[in-house]
Design a protein with these regions (language model features):
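Conserved pre-motif I regulatory segment
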Residues: 1-42
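Hydrophobic/aliphatic anchor position in the core parallel beta-sheet
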Residues: 39, 72, 100, 146, ...
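The conserved Walker
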Residues: 43-47
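Post-DEXD/H (motif II) to motif III coupling segment of the RecA-like Helicase ATP-binding lobe
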Residues: 141-205
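Walker A/P-loop NTP-binding motif
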Residues: 27-39, 49-67, 90
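Conserved catalytic network of the ASCE P-loop NTPase/AAA+ motor domain
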Residues: 32-33, 63-68, 93-95, 114-118, ...
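Conserved nucleic-acid-binding Ia/Ib motif block in the N-terminal RecA-like helicase ATPase lobe
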Residues: 67-125, 129
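Conserved RecA-like ASCE ATPase "motif II neighborhood" in helicase/translocase motors
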Residues: 126-141
Length: 205
């Protein structure tokens, strides 16, 4: 898949960032993500997984804000990963009205709930924080289109894994994406939960 098939605001963002062509693995996975399938996406660092996640999420949300409920939830390991991914999204969405919000393990959960209630499109958070917000009705999943896990190796921690699998139980329909550098038994176990129908995509070398 070339970048020519992306929507105009996203193509303009890529031009501004001087990203001219997809990397080989991105060519392989971008059409699969666009198809709406649930996917395990496994490739080493440097293969372009994070950029593919950002591009695919923005494309799926049509590069524009819509109502107030989040349409994308992205799980990450910790505060540093949440802020880094938020910064990456902000590079692409600088001239769009998409609203990106990172809810990391800061103490004031009531403020985070209010911020999200005011209207966001993409929420980036740790499993613990998202589940805490969900328990106090701080996350409305009725409009959700995509749920992704970035660098899923961190799920070896039981508390992260358990918090993660609880939220999809309340989601009627959305696309699930799990990105990882390598597979491990804990990631494989997601097949027993919300990744039951997922296809495995590995970097072809």
């Amino acid at each position: 898949m070339s970048f020519k098939k992306l929507n105009i605001p996203l193509k303009e963002a890529l031009e501004r960032l001087k990203i001219e062509n997809p990397l080989p693995f991105q060519k392989q996975i971008l059409p699969k993500i666009k198809s709406g399938r649930d996917l395990f996406i496994v490739a080493p660092e440097g293969s372009g997984k994070t950029t593919a996640l950002v591009i695919s999420t923005i494309q799926k949300l049509e590069s524009a804000a819509f109502e107030d409920a989040p349409r994308a939830l992205i799980f990450v390991q910790n505060k540093e990963a949440a802020l880094a991914l938020e910064e990456e999204f902000n590079k692409f969405t600088k001239y769009m009205d998409l609203r990106v919000y990172s809810a990391h393990d800061a103490p004031d959960i009531s403020k985070q709930k209010d911020d999200i209630y005011d209207g966001v499109d993409i929420v980036i958070a740790t499993p613990k924080k998202l589940f805490q917000l969900f328990k106090i009705t701080g996350i409305n999943v009725s409009q959700l289109k995509i749920l992704a896990v970035e660098d899923a190796e961190f799920l070896t921690k039981n508390s992260d894994y358990n918090d993660l699998i609880r939220i999809p139980q309340h989601i009627t329909k959305c696309q699930y994406l799990v990105f990882a550098s390598t597979m491990n038994p804990k990631i494989e176990r997601l097949k027993d939960s919300f990744m039951a129908r997922a296809e495995m995509l590995r970097l072809k070398v």
